[in-house]
Amino acid sequence: MSDRGAGMTRRADDRVIVAGGGIGGLATALTLHQIGVPCVVFEAVREMRPLGVGINLQPNAVRELADLGLTERELDRVGVPAKEWALVGLNGNDVYAEPRGLLAGYRWPQYAVDRGRFHMLLYQNVVERIGPDAVRLGSRVTGYRKNPGGGVTALIEDADGATSEASGALLIGADGIHSAVRAQMHPDQPPIHWGGAVMWRGTTLAKPIRTGSSFVGLGTHRQRIVFYPISHPDPRTGLAAINWIAEVTLDNSEGWKQSGWFRQVGVGDFIHHFDTWVWDWLDVPALIGQADGAFENPMIDRDPVPTWRDGPVVLIGDAAHAMYPTGSNGGSQAIVDARILGAAMVEHGVTQAALAAYNEKLCGPISKLILRNRGAGPFGLLNMVDERCGGTFDNIDDVIPAKERTDFMAGYRAAAGFAIEQLNTAPGDHRARHARACRCSGRVTGAAARLTARAVTPDIRRTSCRGDRTERGRAPLRCRRRATRMPLASRRSSCIALRQAGGTSP
């Protein structure tokens, strides 16, 4: 396998095997390469193509992408910075609204991105930095065998049914909600959990509303719609790609469930649920009706498991914590998982101790977040409005006092790992203690040099993790006025610092 930039020769069984080439798997590969750990990703699809619609990247994930060397220009090509997050009642009045990203005081923006284009951006970075053989397409990990002398053997099946094996020091299960790695680790786990809610996802070209980059959720706990732009407006027409998710809780006896977990449907199949949702500032039927179609799937998750680790094997992303999308943080958490796992390897080496440290830090608090999202997550405010006044009101303060609303949202941000103060102050001592700097040309050890700053300014040269070249690039994704200059010696020898992602628990 190619491992350009590592600067050393390693045996195949020293590498880390990653099962799954989704967002979490690719973020893991980029992180491992950044800290000098060789890896190979096995992905079931024969060809990487942009799939999916909109997702949100919370500031805690954008911080990690910045440290991986992704630029603002790159993310602007696949999405837009979010300016506002708002909940609206059935009569079109605001329940709650707050600024997001830099406008809220974060040091990093929040992005709404086209999931498929963002995934391809990660894939292109993996191929460019590590090499074309870094991701083995058409190869699915079906299980694993722990080796008596240490390490692990992954069992591989290709797209034609042929089987093979791959050995490594560790196996990272990033193979999604239907994870084969998790199924072997927890053979008695209950089936996928479905609470009766069905989602229809699509995009429409329309003019953005409110701030022009607002995330808006409206309705009740049994019927709601979310929409936000995932592209910049066309300067000629003013139209942007508006991502929307319509959701209705149905009876379990509905026949659609037997036709599959994921399918493409016509808008006419569900638009009648929202035909009266028209206000002077938004016409929901018109917005949905312009779409060519939608993707229908049940809102599902998995019950938490007591551990994500089995010796040299560990789970990340949806394989570890598939959760309802009510918090808009599934993709973000997968990125944070990868970075915390990498930080643990910087501290403990490519060892089972690193997996244990990662598991200890995240499994408990993220398991609580799964259940919190199952209970509507931040949309719990809409549930409260529905319970107290039926969803319509003249003055929201008469229904839910301002402090109660603010405290509710602050509690969710803390639980999900992106409370402002918690995230903005996380680097500092935490970075110095838990994530020593990586040297692109050396082995990861506890004695690796530490970087004394976590960002570079636009006017200095930085060593890119895209190989050996240096580039005069834009600053990483953070408030540039707070950027500090990296010492020259560190710039010459090190990648951007990998440090503790931090702040994922309340």
Where are these regions (language model features)?
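C-terminal helical "tail/cap" subdomain of flavin- and related membrane-associated enzymes
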Residues: 3-14, 75, 91-92, 327-329, ...
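Conserved N-terminal helical subregion
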Residues: 3-16, 33, 58-186, 190-203, ...
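Conserved mid-domain beta->alpha element of the FAD-binding
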Residues: 17-46, 172-173, 200, 227, ...
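Conserved FAD/dinucleotide-binding core of flavoprotein oxidoreductases
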Residues: 94-119, 123, 158-165, 203-293
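Cysteine-centered motifs
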Residues: 438-440, 465, 479, 495
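Short, intrinsically disordered C-terminal tails of secreted or membrane-associated proteins
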Residues: 497-505
